[in-house]
């Protein structure tokens, strides 16, 4: 059969590494010490770690240029907030506030005893003094020259006994002075017609003016401290209380990142222990304990150098980056095992320089492919609009490059020094010369003699696990019936994966950014349980400054648009409450119904001044630049509902004859749904094509390069499908892991594919056996070391870290399955090339 390999680049890379290996073998001390000095210098960047930390939820976990941010800019510019005439409805951001939810331990919270406790808590909040000496009264958002107040407390006028005769109606309650909306303050309501029979929960808000962030932050910190200190006392009362502030997510997010630091020591202990155990030999000369330790140390230096460099350059350090060291340790140790395996294939009687040259030549393409694919996958992740993903990808991609650099310098140098020790037949611990084994008892040989090797091949003795792959696993895998079973197994795997892909849920639940034990979780749970009936009260903004509000035909077109919003449904349920639309224009027309521009514009300022609508119309030189109305969404309780609601509202606004924009502060977070799937697919496609190019350049066989690319697609489908079945959503956190998946899915299949086409065996089956014989054990070692690197994250209290573990576990599991089961079998069918 004619040769069909394309190895010009592969040969050049191998030859260059052959020279580098020899150079490292001749000058090991330089290559050992220089990386240490570089790491020490770059490590100074950690001085800036606290300054570079990025904990902003909006900044890190929402699209950089999401539509809602542009809409917010328009609203902020045309409808500036007025803290002296505060209206929660009209906020263009979340505001600065503290809140608590009181849930009755009985069936009804509308009792005198329950409200006595609520009033007590309200008084405690109002009397609380922050460290800067400010009370709520000094900082509160104002309405009609008094602090913003909660409707439920206004209704009872601060007297708990009044609640018994309040005769509340829902969602609107008519008080003596005005109509009050209770949909956001009373939860778990049971009605008789519109009369409230009972309710389960009350929610109160304490909004602050936004002109002094430092004082607000101080007071809000005191707010959480007060409720934290009262927790034991509150548990003995009639109500259960959960609490939250506008700063809570970011504060808990920051604490969350610190919780993973103690796990680093456990991870390094596990990785080093596994490396040592894997490299243990009964021969006291061939033992590679110190090689294993320095391999793990090399990965640690890579993290120190890469992170330090980027911190010096001013790169933001997102919390998601905290998972990177666990990953880099696994990658570094994986390459270490490949290099050790190649070292063991060299002739023991050759000098160290020649052995190093042969080792580097053999390992060069494998570790170069994995490094390029891993690093490129991470750098392609920079295309995402999420800063948390960008930060992770920049730090991890750079760490992968440093890991590669230190493996071929620092670790290679120590491998050469260890080779010199072996050449001198010296003990691995004492470095004393020991006699070569002859006929001494085995126990004596372990401690006192060493340097044995295979007399036939002149190489180090093969480990039993390698013989297992050659004598048992390889022949079993290439058996015809086994191949049939593997094909059926793959079909089952692929079918389950595709099914799972159709079950994927999108979006990150904001409470998952805090630890499981955080007070934030209980507040969100109560909010979801008792206050999900009424969703965001959405602004509908008329952006056309030429719209003729005084023209009856124009008003009718606008009313038609509002009616379209009110008729929207989700899965057969109403999306917008039809009788709760708030329009300044409709109210104005009730007072005066002019079709004349002059009368309309002359009478408008007086109308606005006497109503709450004065913040809803932007007038300049008797021209209405913009105005806004409000629609009340309902039945929005899940992430899927949020996504569909946002899409339907925007589609309706775009479909109207007038220029409309819909906006609510929550849309900033909902925007992730619009880009998460398309962006993930974009990254995967771009990265897969890049991996194909790299494989074609470095693997001397186009068909096998295509199989590597196939492995990427197959592993990604598997991970995406099974992560959905494991209750992991597709969000910016799991997107990071799918980026990782692209790189890691190449690693194992690339090793095996390259070994297959490089094999000197004659038949395809023998090539497959030879490939798993040489690389089966290193692949298992690399997989286990990577799993050990992240397994401690399964015990973390954070969704982010547990998600990282889950997806990495799937990536490694499916990567190994492809590397030592699927790909070797498939190569025997389609990879028969490059031999006679």
What are these regions (language model features)?
Residues 607-736, 743-746, 750-753, 776-778, ...:
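Membrane-proximal extracellular juxtamembrane segment immediately upstream
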Residues 2-290, 294, 405, 411-681, ...:
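Feature of extramembrane
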Residues 346-384, 404, 680, 761-797, ...:
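Pore- and gate-forming transmembrane helices of large, multi-pass membrane proteins
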Residues 265-278, 296-394, 403, 410-416:
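Hydrophobic alpha-helical bundles that form the membrane domains of multi-pass transporters
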Residues 286-339, 703-753:
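Hydrophobic transmembrane alpha-helices and their membrane-interface caps
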Residues 21-25, 76, 249-266, 297, ...:
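Alpha-helical membrane-interface segments at transmembrane helix boundaries
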Residues 2-3, 21, 33-36, 40, ...:
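Transmembrane alpha-helices and their membrane-interface boundaries in multi-pass membrane transporters
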């Amino acid at each position: 059969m004619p040769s069909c390999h394309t190895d010009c680049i592969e040969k050049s890379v191998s030859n260059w590494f052959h020279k580098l290996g020899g150079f490292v073998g001749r000058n090991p001390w330089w290559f050992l010490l220089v990386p240490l000095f570089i790491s020490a210098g770059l490590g100074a960047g950690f001085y800036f770690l606290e300054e570079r930390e990025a904990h902003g939820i909006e900044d890190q976990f929402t699209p950089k240029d999401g539509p809602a941010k542009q809409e917010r800019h328009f609203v902020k510019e045309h409808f500036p907030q007025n803290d002296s005439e505060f209206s929660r409805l009209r906020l263009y951001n979340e505001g600065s506030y503290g809140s608590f939810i009181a849930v009755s331990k009985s069936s009804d919270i509308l009792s005198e005893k329950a409200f006595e406790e609520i009033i007590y808590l309200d008084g405690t909040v109002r009397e609380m003094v922050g460290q800067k000496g400010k009370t709520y009264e000094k900082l509160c958002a104002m309405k009609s020259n008094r602090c913003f107040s909660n409707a439920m407390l206004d209704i009872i006028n601060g007297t708990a006994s009044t609640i018994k005769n309040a005769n509340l109606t829902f969602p609107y309650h008519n008080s003596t002075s005005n109509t009050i909306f209770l949909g956001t303050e009373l939860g778990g309501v049971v009605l008789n017609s519109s009369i409230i029979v009972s309710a389960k929960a009350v929610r109160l808000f304490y909004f602050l003016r936004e002109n002094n962030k430092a004082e607000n932050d101080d007071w809000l910190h005191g707010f959480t401290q007060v409720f934290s200190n009262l927790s034991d006392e509150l548990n003995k009362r009639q109500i259960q209380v959960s609490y939250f502030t506008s700063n809570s997510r970011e504060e808990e997010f920051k604490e969350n990142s610190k919780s993973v630091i103690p796990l680093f020591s456990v991870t390094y202990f596990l990785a080093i222990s596994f490396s040592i155990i894997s490299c243990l030999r009964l021969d006291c000369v061939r033992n590679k304990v110190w090689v294993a330790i320095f391999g793990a140390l090399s990965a640690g230096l890579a993290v120190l150098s890469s992170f330090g460099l980027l911190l010096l350059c001013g790169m933001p350090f997102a919390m998601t980056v905290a998972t990177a060291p666990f990953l880099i340790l696994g990658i570094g140790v994986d390459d270490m095992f490949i290099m050790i395996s190649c070292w063991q294939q060299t002739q023991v009687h050759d000098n160290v320089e020649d052995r190093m040259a042969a080792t580097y030549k053999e390992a060069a393409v494998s570790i170069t492919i994995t490094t390029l694919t891993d690093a490129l996958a991470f750098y392609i992740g920079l295309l995402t609009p999420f800063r948390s993903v960008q930060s992770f990808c920049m730090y991890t991609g750079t760490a992968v490059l440093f890991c590669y650099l230190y493996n071929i310098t620092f670790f290679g140098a120590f491998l050469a020094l260890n080779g010199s020790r072996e050449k001198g037949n010296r003990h691995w611990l004492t470095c004393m010369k020991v006699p070569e084994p002859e006929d001494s008892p085995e126990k004596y040989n372990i401690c006192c003699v060493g340097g044995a090797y295979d007399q036939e091949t002149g190489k180090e003795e093969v480990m039993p696990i390698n013989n297992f792959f050659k004598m048992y696993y390889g022949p079993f895998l290439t058996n015809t019936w086994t191949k049939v079973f593997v094909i059926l197994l793959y079909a089952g795997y692929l079918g389950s994966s595709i099914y799972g892909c159709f079950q994927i849920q999108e979006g990150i639940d904001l409470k998952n950014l805090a630890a499981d034990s955080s007070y934030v979780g209980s507040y969100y749970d109560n909010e979801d349980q008792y206050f999900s009936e009424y969703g965001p009260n959405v602004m509908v903004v008329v952006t056309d400054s030429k719209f003729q509000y005084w023209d009856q035909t124009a008003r009718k077109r606008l009313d038609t648009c509002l009616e379209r919003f009110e008729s929207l449904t989700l899965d057969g349920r109403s999306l917008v409450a039809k009788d709760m639309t708030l329009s300044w224009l409709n109210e104005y027309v009730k007072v005066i119904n002019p079709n004349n521009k002059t009368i309309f514009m002359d009478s408008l300022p007086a109308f606005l001044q006497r109503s709450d609508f004065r913040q809803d119309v932007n007038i300049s030189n008797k021209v209405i630049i913009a105005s806004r109305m409000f629609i009340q969404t309902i039945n929005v309780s899940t992430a899927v509902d949020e996504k569909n609601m946002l899409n339907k509202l925007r589609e309706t606004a775009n479909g109207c004859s007038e220029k409309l924009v819909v906006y609510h502060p929550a849309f900033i977070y909902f925007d992730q749904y619009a880009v998460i799937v398309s962006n993930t697919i974009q990254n995967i496609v771009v990265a897969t094509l890049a991996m194909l190019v790299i494989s074609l350049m470095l693997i001397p066989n186009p068909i096998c390069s295509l199989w590597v690319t196939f492995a990427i697609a197959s592993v990604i489908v598997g991970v995406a499908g099974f992560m959905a079945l494991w209750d992991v959503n597709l969000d910016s956190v799991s997107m990071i892991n799918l980026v990782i998946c692209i790189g890691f899915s190449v690693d194992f299949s690339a090793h095996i594919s390259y070994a297959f086409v490089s094999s000197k065996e004659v038949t395809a089956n023998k090539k497959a056996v030879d490939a798993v014989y040489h690389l089966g054990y290193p692949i298992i070692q690399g997989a286990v070391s990577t799993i050990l690197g992240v397994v401690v994250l399964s015990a973390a209290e954070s969704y982010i870290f547990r998600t990282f573990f889950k997806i990495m576990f799937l990536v490694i599991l499916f990567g190994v399955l492809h590397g030592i089961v699927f790909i070797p079998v498939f190569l025997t069918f389609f990879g028969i090339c490059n031999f006679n």
